[in-house]
């Protein structure tokens, strides 16, 4: 597959999902220097067409910025090579999700909404194309082997639907950050002191 993640190369997303991830899985990866609005707002879609991109991974901020320009910049671009779309970096709102689905995915590409952090080393919560149905604005299910838990302020598990709590991960996973360089106490205090024996995400 031809895979394109539009993240800035200095961010963990690009380390994991432009370099290490795609290349270690035998994919062809695209590195892009520039902004999606220059020389005009069709820049992303011209690249998708030129290189026949199959998997496209970008941030909701970029999607919202492009959606504000309408759909005219996509009309003359062939996006038929796209098979999977992804979002990363922040929650995606309903309007942006629907625009992405309709105009970029042509209502024919699963949208993989991902949740993770620099400290997690990789995606922990995400839909899986063709396995878990898309649900607009939701990252949906934990990835294989990941066991998230929602806690109240006292550390008790919340099992009700549509409730607000503190997102934690119950057990370690292979890519978890091991420490903060030169300050292991800070690492423990930041991620493991709020709730005993659980990784606190801050979300």
Where are these regions (language model features)?
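Short coil-to-beta-strand transition motifs
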Residues: 138-145, 199
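Gly/Ser/Thr-rich phosphate-binding loop
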Residues: 1-3, 20, 24-27, 54-58, ...
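Alpha-helix/helix-capping structural signal
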Residues: 61-64, 174-175
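Active-site glycine-centered loops adjacent to acidic/histidine catalytic or metal-binding residues
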Residues: 8, 89, 116, 140, ...
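Conserved ATP-binding/catalytic segment of the ANL
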Residues: 157-162, 168-203
């Amino acid at each position: 597959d031809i895979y394109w993640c539009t993240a800035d190369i200095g961010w963990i997303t690009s380390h994991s999902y432009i370099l290490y991830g795609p290349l270690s899985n035998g994919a062809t990866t695209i590195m892009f220097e520039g902004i999606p609005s220059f020389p005009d707002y069709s820049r992303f879609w011209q690249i998708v067409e030129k290189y026949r991109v199959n998997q496209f991974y970008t941030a909701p901020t970029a999607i919202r910025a492009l959606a504000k320009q309408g759909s005219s910049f996509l009309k003359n671009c062939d996006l038929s090579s796209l098979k999977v779309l992804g979002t990363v970096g922040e929650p995606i709102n309903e309007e942006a999700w629907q625009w992405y689905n309709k105009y970029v995915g042509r209502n024919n590409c699963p949208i993989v909404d991902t949740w993770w952090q620099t400290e997690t080393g990789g995606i922990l919560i995400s839909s899986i194309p063709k396995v878990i149905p898309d649900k607009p604005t939701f990252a949906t299910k934990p990835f294989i082997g990941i066991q998230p838990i929602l806690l109240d302020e006292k550390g008790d598990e919340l099992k009700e639907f549509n409730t607000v709590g503190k997102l934690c991960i119950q057990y370690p996973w292979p890519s978890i950050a091991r420490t903060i360089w030169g300050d292991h106490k800070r690492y423990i205090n930041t991620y493991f002191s709020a709730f005993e024996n659980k990784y606190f995400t801050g979300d």
